[in-house]
Amino acid sequence: MRVLGRMAALVGAAAMLVAIPGNARAASPKFSETTTIGTHNAYEKGKYTYWAQALDSGASLLELDVYADSVSRRWRVSHDKPLANDNNCEYADEPSELYSKDRNQDLGSCLDNMAAWNQLHPDHAPIVVKVEMKAGFNNDAGLGPDEFDTLVSKKLGSSVYKPSDLLGGSYSSLDAAAKANAWPTRDALKGKFVFELIPGTVEESNPLDSYWTDEEYGDHLRDLYAAGRIGEAQAFPAVLGAANGDPRTSRYDASIRPWFVFFDGDAATYVNSGYDTSFYSTNHYILIMTDAYGVSPAISSTNPTDAEVAARLALLAKDHASIITSDWSAKSASVLGSVATRG
């Protein structure tokens, strides 16, 4: 281990771990009880040559930008090309094909890569796949929540941790399940992907679009549950944007508020503004803090030292984050795979 890596490990251990005597083994913490690190826009070729390398990175969250292309009726993966693919996902659906095939593929191929990689790493730590629907769903073109669920289910099957898994047959809403801390342990989530959905920047700036991804998928979850089909849903919609208090109250109809247990917003806004983020950990909600580098004192957004990453993780764990994200793709798997105790 390099000196800085050792320092980071020691800092993290001292700040966040409790010593276990003798040969006793600590029980695996629940998914809601830890703080981990994710990579913003991990599909970009400048960060990882191949999507499989992003999966190898140790990061606990990887982000995809997706466009619903009404012309081709395909899910495009790109930052700013709604009718084309520009990404590190390969045309590969077998483990032996990874790290070698043509890139710039659609969402289906990104999921194929994940399925193939999963065969090589069946006990990997849980990975949140954050999907930004850049311009929203397009239900009229056959690219709505139902079709998204169908694609994810077809490609990844039982390797997805779904809303119905959190409900477990015991709770009538995701909110009730989260408040009961019904989340599984991290060990129980080995080999699993968890999908988070957020509205996209194009959608948010479109004056003709007032039905954003979060609300549309929230309606979708409510309706599936009412129809006895909640098992079909593959993703958790997130409330986007840092706010004080419970942002669901002012944003959504009361009928869908209980279907939001993921929250996603700028770390500096949460922390530097003094928002009471204990609300999220008290209720066992999943809180993703983005642009973690920007919290005072700011550190590099791309390549901070290992010790700086460890300190930032410890700081934001105390501020009740579940996952902190930045563009730290240059960091090693031992750094990006760090797990801290939340709260």
Regions found by a protein language model. Give the residues of each.
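Secretory targeting and sorting signals
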Residues: 1-26
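Catalytic cores of phosphodiester-bond hydrolases, prominently lipid phosphodiesterases
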Residues: 27-343
